[in-house]
């Protein structure tokens, strides 16, 4: 049966109860009854649809591991990030063709999705193993993984002693036309604006924009271009990507500038999930020790207590999560507008 036909026939998509309301009732059962009921209902649903900003390879690895645990649930996946994911979800809501069951995207990008009414709270039993800073009180967001943001540099083009040591160093004329940056680093922008203050922050950003940055789609692309020598410095690299490339012998090293921050990538329940019981099992498993251990195998940092990190050096210098007030939809909208006007005025 096609996904579209499945949605049209799915009572969860059009019933009065949202996915969160349904699962909240199930959560009142004893752990044993809850487990058995979820498994029974999920088996009848037969599938779950996962929207994620992870790489295709990582999504496939995660899906395969989940299938090993729950072979009766097929995992449908959609890989995207940023504004494209938001636009897709908005279009589906308007058309009343809600495909997503579980959504994984950065916290700041999750804000407009929540504002659309596309998310529901879900208090997974696994949430108790996550520190308070890595989940919201209402149950909408739980950290799936954390992405420390680092500055990278091509070691063939930049000597260690010459690499920028702070954000002011990026304004040095010698780096003009030599720097790459992701074109949607809204959390990075928000953290620095809060760190500098509004007036100083805007002055800094305008001066940085005058350095003729090469704006690229996505941090992975920034890292690849940096390794290829198409730039000397990458301002916004994912920490795990930088360390993986360095581990493989690429001419790349990294610096943790101050403020050093980590972007939380959340995992969330879609409000109108067509397969709510399978969604609950997928969420529970993804946040479990087993699921989180697989996520660390990708080099990503996780917040769950007791899970061994692949790259612990990324957390040796204390990082802070993107402040939750930066994730407020109204604040995020202002930050996005400011960033675009400064760095991408022609788009």
Predicted segments, located by residue:
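A ligand-binding cleft/hinge motif common to bilobed small-molecule-binding domains
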Residues: 109-112, 232-251
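Periplasmic-binding protein-like
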Residues: 132, 146-149, 175-184, 205-209, 214-216, 286-308, ...
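Immediate post-signal peptide segment of exported/extracytoplasmic ligand-binding proteins
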Residues: 15-49, 67-68, 171-176
């Amino acid at each position: 049966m096609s996904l579209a036909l499945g949605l049209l026939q799915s009572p969860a998509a059009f019933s009065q109860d949202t996915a969160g309301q349904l699962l909240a009732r199930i959560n009142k059962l004893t752990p044993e009854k809850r487990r058995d009921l979820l498994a029974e209902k999920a088996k009848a649903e037969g599938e779950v649809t996962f929207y994620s900003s992870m790489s295709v390879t990582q999504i496939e690895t995660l899906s395969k591991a989940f299938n090993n645990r729950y072979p009766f649930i097929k995992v449908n996946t959609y890989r995207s990030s940023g504004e494209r994911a938001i636009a897709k979800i908005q279009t589906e809501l308007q058309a009343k063709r809600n495909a997503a069951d579980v959504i994984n995207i950065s916290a700041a990008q999750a804000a407009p999705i929540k504002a659309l009414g596309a998310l529901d709270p879900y208090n997974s039993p696994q949430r108790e193993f996550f520190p308070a800073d890595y989940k919201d009180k209402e149950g909408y967001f739980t950290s799936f993984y954390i992405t420390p943001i680092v500055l990278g540099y091509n070691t063939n083009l930049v000597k260690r002693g010459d690499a920028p040591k702070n954000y002011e160093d990026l304004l040095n004329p010698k780096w003009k036309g030599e720097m790459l940056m992701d074109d949607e680093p809204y959390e990075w922008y928000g953290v620095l604006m809060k760190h500098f203050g509004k007036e100083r922050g805007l002055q800094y950003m305008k001066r940085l924009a005058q350095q003729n940055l090469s704006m690229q789609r996505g941090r992975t692309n920034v890292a690849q271009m940096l390794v290829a020598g198409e730039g000397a410095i990458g301002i916004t690299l994912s920490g795990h990507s930088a360390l993986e490339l360095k581990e493989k012998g690429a001419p790349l090293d990294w610096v943790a500038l101050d403020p050093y921050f980590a972007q939380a990538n959340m995992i969330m329940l879609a409000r109108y999930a067509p397969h709510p019981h399978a969604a609950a099992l997928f969420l529970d498993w993804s946040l479990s020790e087993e699921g989180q251990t697989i996520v660390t195998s990708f080099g990503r940092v996780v917040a769950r207590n007791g899970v061994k990190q692949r790259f612990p050096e990324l957390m040796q210098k204390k990082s802070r999560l993107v402040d939750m007030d930066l994730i407020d939809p109204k604040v995020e909208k202002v930050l996005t507008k400011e960033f675009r006007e400064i760095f991408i005025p022609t788009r």
